[in-house]
Amino acid sequence: MTDDATQRRRLEAGLAQIGLALAPAQIDTLFAYLALLRKWNGVYNLTAIRHPDEMLTHHMLDSLAAVPALAEAARAAEVGTPARGRVLDVGSGGGMPGLPLAIACPDVSVLMVDIVQKKTAFLTQCRAQLGLSNAAAHWGPVEKLDDASGFAVITSRAFAELTDFVNLSGQLLAPHGKLIAMKGVYPQAELDRMEAAGLMAQWQVDAVPRITVPGLDAERHLVVLSRRASAHA
């Protein structure tokens, strides 16, 4: 098992590669979160990944690699108040990417939704122990979430394929907001199914950038969607 000092060096190197400049206290909080995830995972089976090194790459750095894009979209000037700066993490599970985003970006407000109560209990515990006033958890299906303000960004990492993601959560997106789905290989088949379902009449694909996860030899893409101008009318 890699020691804590080595893991910290790996995380700091990964943050530099991603382009995230975090204070030492924020890095401490990221590690405190990983410690909580390992502790709770032994009892509640929050994730199949259990080795600390893999948790660092497959969970933490995988989520942090998406933070620049998520934060930029959340802070976008064209998203009006009160949705500006608000992010919804759908199917957050053990808190990815919601908690790393909240730790890295204190000005961004993150609501994490999951249908599994033990997972939202863990997220609520993390909020309390890590002192994250900009993070909250909600237990229940996203399609039943009642939120009048809307969100500048709605994201998911391992929730569902694109058609379901759009159908279940799209109504919560604020005008000019972005749906940002975290995917592995380029999801052409999912995009084709979106078109076949008729969703492209209301939604457009703004970009599908490939992102690099430090220490992980696997493809990662973000699918960035927004409502077509005609859908706002």
Curated annotation (Swiss-Prot):
Enzyme class: transferase
Pfam families in alphabetical order: GidB
CDD domains: AdoMet_MTases (cd02440)
EC number(s) recorded for this UniProt protein: 2.1.1.170
Signal peptide extent: none
InterPro entries membership: rRNA_ssu_MeTfrase_G, SAM-dependent_MTases_sf
Similarity comment: family membership: Belongs to the methyltransferase superfamily. RNA methyltransferase RsmG family.
Protein name: Ribosomal RNA small subunit methyltransferase G
Native source organism of the sequence: Cupriavidus necator (strain ATCC 17699 / DSM 428 / KCTC 22496 / NCIMB 10442 / H16 / Stanier 337) (Ralstonia eutropha)
Taxonomic classification: Bacteria, Pseudomonadati, Pseudomonadota, Betaproteobacteria, Burkholderiales
